[in-house]
């Protein structure tokens, strides 16, 4: 079943593999499956944490999207990635999918830096919210029932709003907003438009992160 789901979705499979390997490396260092961040160099060096965003620390805005806090966090996100990501990748194409996914990670990080600067954050869920928004556009393009993707987004947003302090509110909302902005052009019939959408979203996210973390704009805590 898993092989069939990931057929023609190499990027989805690769992202899931990278997330799993990062988790295993952090778990081995921390000697734990339930808290792999602060007792491992892998976790401590890749988690998004605003005060550490400087120089090489900028990579945290990307690497944090491949780090998960515990085994349950990893399993839930990889389950969503495999089934939602594979569907989106098969529709939009592998190249545009990769650009859009990375843009989703960065826009989620952007939102966290803007609204919750000093909150340590990790996980693929911001990018998954991006993909869920795109999934709605795919259903519309196919003229299929919109209820399933709308319910999926609605349930996840409700869970986010009802779970303060346990999930990244701003990461999720930032990823969802990015997906909403990309969804229509990313599902265009034009492959050139799909590539351009992912590329522009990625570049804009990078520029916004840079602007947010300039010395004159970094929040003082």
Report each predicted region and the residues it spans.
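Hydrophobic transmembrane alpha-helices
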Residues: 85, 133-138, 178-187
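Membrane-interface micro-motifs in multi-pass membrane enzymes
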Residues: 117-134, 168-171
